[in-house]
Amino acid sequence: MPADARTETTDTTAATGGRRPLRVLIAADTFAPDVNGAATFTEELAVGLAQRGHEVHVIAPSWNRTHHGSFDEEYRGVTLTVHRLASYRWPAHAWYRFAWPWTVRKHTAPVIDALQPDVVHIQSHIVVGRGVAREAHDRGIRIIGTNHFMPENLLEYTPFGKRTTPIALKIAWRDAAKTYRLAEAITTPTELAADYLRDAIAGQPVLAISCGIDATRYTPATGRPAGNDIVFVGRVAPEKNLDVVIRALPLLPAALDAHFTIVGDGDMIPKLTALAQELGVEDRVRFLGFVPDEVKLRTLTEGTVFVMPSTAELQSISSLEAMASGLPVVAADAMALPHLIDGNGALFAPGDEHDLAAKLASVLTAPDDEYARMRARSLTMIEAHDINRTLSTFEALYRGEPVAAGPEGR
C-alpha cells in the first residue's frame, strides 16, 4: 500500500454549503463489486459525499488475490480513491473476502498518516473497521461507526453448532462493543436495530439513521405489468430463506402463472435449483446471478411484487430499492421489515410458505385500483429514506455537530 495516498481537497465549497470540504476515510469490510446492503450503502455514501464536494477515500478488501493497492475507481460517474487490502476468500462462503486481521493496522496506518482525514467512518467492527478504528483513535481522529452487522448471518458460515452459537454471539457482541466505544457516534439503519444494538453493546448511545437511497435512479413502471413476476434482490444465502418462496410458488393459483426472479449470487443456488426441480417449478424460477446495475434496475421496474423472506434484516436496502421502483412488498414479519410495510403490501409469518402464498396471491389478484394504491404507497414511503437526508445527517456528525435521530426505517 503506497504511503503517498494523499490527493488535494477540492477548493470548491459551493456543494458543501460554503463550508470547508472534509477529507473522509470510509473503512468497510465489504464494498463494490460485492452485492449486499452494506456494500450498497457504502457506495451510495461515498458517491454522495464526493458529489457534495468532499474528498472521499475508501479502505476495503480486494476483490481478488492480486488487486490490492491504491486505485482510482469510478462509481456512477464519480471517481473515488479506494485502498484495497490483500484479501482471501472465506472458505465456507461463496464470495466473502477478508483481510487477515493482524495485517490491517500495519497496512492502513501509512494511508491514514498520508491522508490525515478529518473523520473516519467505519461500516462494521469486524476486521477492517476494527483495525482502522484503532489506528484513528491512536491519532485522535474523529470516528463515526455504523453497524450493518447481524452476527447470526456470519455464524451461518462458521463451524459453531446450536449449542455453542449463544456463546459465540456473546463473544461477537463483546468484541463489537470494544470497537464502537472508540466512536464519537454510533449509528444503525432503524430504531429497532438501534434498540437491538444498544442491548448488545451494553447500552451505548445509538442513533437510528436510514441508509437512504437515491430514488431518482429507479424507474416505476406505468400501469400494471402484464405478467406476475415475483422479484428478490440480494445474496442467495441461507439467512435469506429463499426456499420459503420457492415452496410457496406451487401453492399459488395456477391461473396466475407466477414466476420468481432472483437477482444475486450465493452458495444456496444449487440447493434452491434442486428444490425447484423437486417441486416441479424449475421453469418458473430464474437465477440471474450477479448482473450489471442497469439489469437489476430494469428487473425491478418490470416486476409485479417484491418479496423479502429474510428474518435478519436491519433495514433491507433491496426492499427500499423495490419501493423506489414502485413495487408492492411482501416481507417476513421479523426484525426491521415490518417498518417498511404500511398499505404497500403485506407481512407473512416467517418461514410459513402457506401464509406467504396467501399474501402474494392477495397482491397479485388485487383489483387494479388497489394494486395502484399499493404502488403509490411504496413511492410515498420511500421519500423518508431520501439519500440527501442521510448525507446531511452524516455530514453533521463528521463535523461534530449534534443531530436528531433519523431519518430511520419506521
Name these PLM-found stretches:
Residues 1-84, 389:
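N-terminal subdomain of nucleotide-sugar transferases
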Residues 62, 192, 212:
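Carbohydrate-associated surface elements
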Residues 138, 151, 167-185, 200:
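Membrane-proximal helix-turn-helix segments that form the acceptor-binding/catalytic region
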Residues 222-249, 261:
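Conserved donor-binding/catalytic core segment of Leloir-type glycosyltransferases
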Residues 271-291:
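Nucleotide-activated donor-binding/catalytic signature segment of Leloir-type glycosyltransferases, i.e.
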Residues 311:
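Aromatic "clamp/platform" in nucleotide-sugar-dependent glycosyltransferases that forms part
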Residues 328-331:
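Short hydrophobic beta-strand element within catalytic cores of glycosyltransferases
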Residues 343-353, 362-368:
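Conserved acidic donor-binding segment of nucleotide-sugar-dependent glycosyltransferases
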